[in-house]
């Protein structure tokens, strides 16, 4: 997206500053530091990354939000973006046993029925995921 000239904001969240991953890599790609949140307040916003996202969404319009991480956090983020009618793509971290859709160990409940994360995902439209 950045190489295509799109404006991109990245929000990273972790329990502590030491647990933040890829901060330098995102800085190199973005040309500026990503937004960061730490649960303990040791770096950036003191609290969850959803707090940062909520603040950002109040400052300017967004065409899309993409999210990965723990499902409870993604659910919370999707509640925020859904209330603002912002399309949201989520990457679900499901265990994939076979990787070809045969074993059904990675199914995700959606408004269109069950989808296999390994074949149909792992990125899904958050509005279609049944939490």
Where are these regions (language model features)?
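FNR/FR-type flavoprotein reductase catalytic core
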Residues: 1-90
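Local cysteine-cluster metal-coordination motifs and their immediate loop/turn environment
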Residues: 71, 93-122
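Short microdomains enriched in Cys/His and/or Lys/Arg
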Residues: 119-131
């Amino acid at each position: 997206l950045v190489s295509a000239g799109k404006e991109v904001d990245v929000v990273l969240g972790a329990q502590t500053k030491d647990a933040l991953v890829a901060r330098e890599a995102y800085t190199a790609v973005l040309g500026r530091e990503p937004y960061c949140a730490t649960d303990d307040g040791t770096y950036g916003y003191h609290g969850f990354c959803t707090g940062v996202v909520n603040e950002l969404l109040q400052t300017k319009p967004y065409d899309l939000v993409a999210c990965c991480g723990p499902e409870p956090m993604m659910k919370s983020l999707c509640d925020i973006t859904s209330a603002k009618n912002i399309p949201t793509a989520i990457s679900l971290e499901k265990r994939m046993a076979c990787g070809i859709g045969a074993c059904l160990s990675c199914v995700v409940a959606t408004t269109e029925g069950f989808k296999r994360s390994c074949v149909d995902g792992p990125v899904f439209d958050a509005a279609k995921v049944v939490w």
